[in-house]
């Protein structure tokens, strides 16, 4: 039943992906393999089809286990709640004398709440899960640590946002400091009924110093290697760089400039006004307001809170107007500083950084919340400050999306690159990257 599975966070992996993962892992002959949330058993069958004999599985769903047993023809599969039971009890129920070499699978991912619970008296375990993000897949990872041998490998399909969402930071930091991330494969929105993107993360139970994480993409039914990043580079959030150029640009921007959150003197956050006249996200367009003239004085920038890669930042100077909760507000010193910030925000450089390194290259609709905007590299450059302010004022006065408007936007991009000392090769690369994802309506070269 689709609604039952969705409510329980159950998304079965098809044979194609499970077989590809088994092949990718290059599991040695004779290794002991366990899928502790095996569902109907596609990982089990894939492992057996690859010649592995020591394959074990368990799941809380008796009907799924019955189907798994019929499909696989093996007896090492049992009905068991592997989130509620600890590792020793799970191994004993499966008649395994010691932890296994490989823990694989696609554990359920759904937030723990009054309807979704883990039935265990182990308060320390529940406390760790709660402090690490309070989701069933978090519990599954902690249990996997108990099920894998000291040099064992854990390979799970989990939500991509595990890599950067703040609530998961405790477990992320533990993995970075005490385990070894062998690889991360970005498979995008693989399960169409899931709200979000997924990754395949493969860990070694022990920590190996001076290790590089292999990062892969997924396309044409293949895992495509992108690059390797030292695990020591990360201390909390894990960014999936697409190539060496992205990695190089990120390191330079991070090391050379302060962040917007460190430089902004005022409020950065959601609008709070309940007034019927408050500006909403839909009232904003790039550099102007749809139903009102742009104010001349004030200290506020209004940004549509909904962000899409196709459009990028949509924001306007808003003077002293009030904003609803569908708007992100930045307040700073005066109208000139606000217009300078506005120019930076609309640049391709800013949107490139936001998409790639704040949203971790997500293709889904995101939000321009303060926690993301504050990460943007920011410099008040005396050489280009007045140029950017002048171009923004010109854009406010020019007919929206006219040829003159687009020409001014291109001039703005050039000046922002100058502001950040981005050379021609890197600016050309960033332009090309953004034109791949942005809608053609925002590309002046396509408009001409």
Predicted regions and their residues:
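N-terminal, positively charged/glycine-rich alpha-helical extensions of SAM-dependent methyltransferases
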Residues: 1-3
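Proline-centric
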Residues: 21-23, 27, 110, 144-148, ...
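Conserved acidic residues
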Residues: 31, 101, 300
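Signature of N6-adenine DNA methyltransferases within the class I
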Residues: 6-7, 12-20, 24, 37-45, ...
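Conserved residues in the N-terminal Rossmann fold of short-chain dehydrogenase/reductase
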Residues: 79
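Conserved class I S-adenosyl-L-methionine
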Residues: 30-37
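Non-catalytic DNA-recognition/assembly elements of restriction-modification systems
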Residues: 104, 226-284, 380-448
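Polybasic, glycine- and aromatic-enriched phosphate-binding surface used to engage nucleic acids
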Residues: 244-386
């Amino acid at each position: 039943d689709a609604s039952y599975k969705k409510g329980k966070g159950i998304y079965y992996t098809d044979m194609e992906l499970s077989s590809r993962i088994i092949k990718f892992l290059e599991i040695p002959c004779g290794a002991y393999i366990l899928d502790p949330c095996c569902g109907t058993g596609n990982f089990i069958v894939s492992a057996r089809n690859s010649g592995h004999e020591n394959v074990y599985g368990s799941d809380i769903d008796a009907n799924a286990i019955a189907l798994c047993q019929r499909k696989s023809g093996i007896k090492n599969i049992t009905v068991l709640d592997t989130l509620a039971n600890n590792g020793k009890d799970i191994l004993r129920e499966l008649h395994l004398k010691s932890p296994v070499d490989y823990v694989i699978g696609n554990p359920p991912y759904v937030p723990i709440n009054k309807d979704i619970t883990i039935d265990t008296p182990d308060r320390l375990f529940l406390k760790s899960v709660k402090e690490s993000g309070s989701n069933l897949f978090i519990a599954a990872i902690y249990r996997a640590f108990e099920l894998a041998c000291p040099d064992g490998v854990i390979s799970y399909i989990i939500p991509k946002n595990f890599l950067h969402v703040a609530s998961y930071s405790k477990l992320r930091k533990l993995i970075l400091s005490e385990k070894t991330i062998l690889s991360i494969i970005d498979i995008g929105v693989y399960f169409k009924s899931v709200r979000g993107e997924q990754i395949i993360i493969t860990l070694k139970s022990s920590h190996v110093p001076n290790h590089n994480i292999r990062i892969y993409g997924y396309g044409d039914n293949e895992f495509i290697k992108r690059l390797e990043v030292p695990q020591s580079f990360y201390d909390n959030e894990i960014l999936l760089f697409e190539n060496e150029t992205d990695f190089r640009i990120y390191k330079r921007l991070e090391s050379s400039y302060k962040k917007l959150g460190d430089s902004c003197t005022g409020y950065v956050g959601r609008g709070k006004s309940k007034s019927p006249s408050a500006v909403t996200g839909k009232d904003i367009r790039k550099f102007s307001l749809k139903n009102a003239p742009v104010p001349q004085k004030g200290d506020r920038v209004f940004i549509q809170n909904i962000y899409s890669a196709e459009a990028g930042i949509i924001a306007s100077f808003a003077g002293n107007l009030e904003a609803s909760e569908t708007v992100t507000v930045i307040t700073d010193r005066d109208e000139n500083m606000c217009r300078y910030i506005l120019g930076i925000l609309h640049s391709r450089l800013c949107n490139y950084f936001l998409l790639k390194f704040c949203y971790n290259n997500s293709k889904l609709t995101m939000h321009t919340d303060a926690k993301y905007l504050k990460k943007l590299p920011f410099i008040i450059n005396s050489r280009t400050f007045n140029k950017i302010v002048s171009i923004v004022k010109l854009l406010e006065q020019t007919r929206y999306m006219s040829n003159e408007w687009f020409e001014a936007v291109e001039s703005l991009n050039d000046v922002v690159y100058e502001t950040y000392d981005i050379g021609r090769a890197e600016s050309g690369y960033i332009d090309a990257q953004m034109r791949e994802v942005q809608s053609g309506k925002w590309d002046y070269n396509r408009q001409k």
